[in-house]
């Protein structure tokens, strides 16, 4: 049976996955440079994986792509626009050949036509309920697992609903002060989870949550 | 010159130092057993220190008592009562011989007479401003450092005011979901701090914040 997994979601020491006021010229929100600092471990680990190196960060990063057949994300992760689409020229942050290579379901109150990209990535835009979208993603994954890509609000919704099987998050050694907290507004959903791993590399701390 | 230090403050993975509704029969607030779970590393490390053992947790724990000449705490850390003192029979959580053995300054809107305990601990109750209380504590420390003992609200106030030199906190691998967040409401105070250490033992992750 397909698992629902979250991987490589980076938060600051004070718990923020993104700052306030995300927008096109500041995809992680207000503040200079901290979006880069927050994800610097990710960039370094990506280079390590590409070079065939192993290590705590590279191993955790690579795990996130293994056996994933479909991805679900929030509209804010797909793009910086809010409200109705002014036009449909925006095709995501990732260029013509996005690094998914499978079906990606984008939760949005403003659906638009399905978008087929090079390399096998197809973006589906939907305002259906979580369970319906997850069902479609499981079908699309065809026996592989489904990844919830983010952002924080979407992960919270799936966690609160108890729909996530494994959540890997990464604590970066920095303070942001304000923005969007990942582990917040979880209600009783969190009672079903326990920490199964906590390990620190020279750069960050990796934490895994799994069902009790 | 005296430093102002915070040590061994334990927070959950989701950032809480205490739950909601702290009271006499639930000093860490609502919820069964998690106060014990949050601090289980502390109990084990205390036993290790007493037995002369070393290790990541024991070493961090012991550091918190080194070269400390005075302690500052909030009234909620001194006791579970709120509002005016019904009587003054409460003498803290720690019995007749508290583990401080120096002057302890308790921030409270409801001052009461100074309380001399066995073993050299003297509790002073004050509604003076942070800077005044810190000045008194520095004098009392007589060349040694001053420790801010807690709870979360008092640590936040000193951090926001930029008055803390070193902050050692401990992340326990558990979720609490609601309560009092330590790294919250810090305003621009946090801009003066950086993470100087992050290390994980088999039990917890230790993090140190210092001035930039």
Walk through the language-model features, giving the residues of each.
Chain A
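Enzymes that bind and transform nitrogen-containing heteroaromatic metabolites
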Residues: 1-212
């Amino acid at each position: 049976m397909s698992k629902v997994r979250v991987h490589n979601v980076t938060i600051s020491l004070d718990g923020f996955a993104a700052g306030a006021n995300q927008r096109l010229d500041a995809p992680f929100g207000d503040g200079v440079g901290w979006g880069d600092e927050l994800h610097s471990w990710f960039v370094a680990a990506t280079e390590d994986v590409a070079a065939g190196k192993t290590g705590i960060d590279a191993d955790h990063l690579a795990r996130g792509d293994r056996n994933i057949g479909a991805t679900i994300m929030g509209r804010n992760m797909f793009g910086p626009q809010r409200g109705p689409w002014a036009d449909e020229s925006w095709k995501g942050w990732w260029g013509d050949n996005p690094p998914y290579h499978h079906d990606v379901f984008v939760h949005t109150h403003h659906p638009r036509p399905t978008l087929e990209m090079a390399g096998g990535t197809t973006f589906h835009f939907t305002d259906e309920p979580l369970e319906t979208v997850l069902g479609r993603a499981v079908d699309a994954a065809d026996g592989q697992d489904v990844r919830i890509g983010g952002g924080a609000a979407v992960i919270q919704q799936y966690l609160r609903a108890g729909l996530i099987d494994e959540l890997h998050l990464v604590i970066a050694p920095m303070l942001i002060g304000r923005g969007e907290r990942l582990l917040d507004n979880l209600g009783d959903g969190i009672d079903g989870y326990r920490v199964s791993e906590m390990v620190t590399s020279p750069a960050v701390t990796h934490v895994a949550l799994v069902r009790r």
